[in-house]
From Swiss-Prot:
Cellular compartments per GO CC: endoplasmic reticulum membrane; oligosaccharyltransferase complex
Ranges annotated as spanning the membrane: 195-215, 229-249, 253-273
Coiled coil: none
Cytoplasmic face residues: 216-228, 274-286
Record organism: Saccharomyces cerevisiae (strain ATCC 204508 / S288c)
Gene Ontology BP annotations: protein N-linked glycosylation
Protein family per UniProt: Belongs to the SWP1 family.
Protein name: Dolichyl-diphosphooligosaccharide--protein glycosyltransferase subunit SWP1
Pathway(s): Protein modification; protein glycosylation
Other information: Present with 8450 molecules/cell in log phase SD medium.
Listed InterPro entries: Ribophorin_II_C (IPR056790), Swp1 (IPR008814)
Role noted for this protein: Subunit of the oligosaccharyl transferase (OST) complex that catalyzes the initial transfer of a defined glycan (Glc(3)Man(9)GlcNAc(2) in eukaryotes) from the lipid carrier dolichol-pyrophosphate to an asparagine residue within an Asn-X-Ser/Thr consensus motif in nascent polypeptide chains, the first step in protein N-glycosylation. N-glycosylation occurs cotranslationally and the complex associates with the Sec61 complex at the channel-forming translocon complex that mediates protein translocation across the endoplasmic reticulum (ER). All subunits are required for a maximal enzyme activity.
Gene: SWP1
GO molecular function: structural molecule activity
């Protein structure tokens, strides 16, 4: 039993050694002479809910420069070194990359945060929100275990100065947008009116030209009315013309193109036969 306890303790120590730990974390203010730095201390990974209260700093100068410094063992550098500044609950955060200098067994990390260069949308929302701006440190690698990566809030900034709200559209511009719903319009149930008018004019001019031609050639006269079998072909010819006019009128009023094509096919086959026979026999009697 003692052996297993010792082994478990050894494994825990090894895991702690491999974890990313920020040593001697402190905040300095290089833009303000004489302002003392703020010590945070060692920051290490925490599993589960982190109940540690982050350090709070009140900022009264809108041009303040805040510098976050810490050290990491040179043999255990993380691939991702990011400091997030912003309001996580509002999805307004800016990512800062560090300046890294190797100093023997330790690597010195320095993040420089210039408040004057923070996004206007972030500053405007922070001035309206009761919660402070949060600084979250991320030290992680894809090859490390989740419990070895560091993702912790280390600092809170209370802004004690007036923020310019002249361009209030910035918050809405970078905020969460409502979901886009696209409405697909239904397929048109009738042909476009300009196209229908063009075809009506073409058919009207064609029929009018046909009637004028018949009158000028004396083909349309009472003494030329067909009789016998030719009269049947004549009625079929007239029915074909009237039928196609009705089909086209129904198409313009809302009948689908497929029904129109089927109707034209059903009328066109017998209409072509009777009209051809009528015109052939009628042409011989003119």
């Amino acid at each position: 039993m003692q052996f297993f306890k010792t082994l478990a303790a050894l494994v825990s120590c090894i895991s702690f050694v491999l974890a990313y730990v920020a040593q001697d974390v402190h905040v300095s203010f290089p833009s303000t002479a004489g302002k003392s730095r703020v010590m945070i201390g060692k920051v290490e990974p925490r599993i589960g809910i982190d109940e540690t209260v982050p350090t709070t700093i009140t900022v009264e100068d809108p041009n303040e420069v805040i510098q976050v410094n810490f050290a990491i063992e040179s043999t255990n550098k993380p691939f991702q070194n990011t400091l997030l500044i912003g309001l996580p609950n509002k999805n307004l955060e800016m990512a800062f990359e560090p300046e890294i200098k190797d100093n023997g067994k330790l690597s010195m990390y320095k993040y420089r945060i210039d408040l004057a260069k923070l996004d206007a949308a972030l500053l405007q929302e922070a001035s309206r929100s009761p919660e402070p701006i949060k600084a979250t440190l991320i030290l992680a690698s894809s090859t490390a275990k989740p419990k070895e990566n560091l993702f912790r809030e280390i600092l809170q900034l209370n802004l004690n100065f007036d923020v310019d709200h002249s361009d209030s559209s910035l918050v809405d511009k970078f905020g969460i947008k409502p979901e886009i719903h696209h409405i697909f319009h239904a397929e048109p149930k009738r042909v476009a009116k300009p196209i229908a008018v063009i075809f009506v004019l073409i058919i009207f001019i064609t029929i009018l030209s046909l009637i004028v031609t018949w009158l000028n050639s004396c083909a349309a006269a009472f003494n030329n009315i067909p009789t016998g079998v030719t009269a049947v072909y004549f009625l079929g010819f007239i029915a074909t013309i009237v039928g196609f006019e009705v089909i086209f009128a129904r198409y313009y009023l809302g009948t689908s193109i497929f029904e129109t094509l089927f109707s034209s096919l059903y009328l066109g086959a017998p209409g072509l036969l009777t009209s051809t026979k009528f015109l052939r026999s009628f042409g011989q009697t003119i």
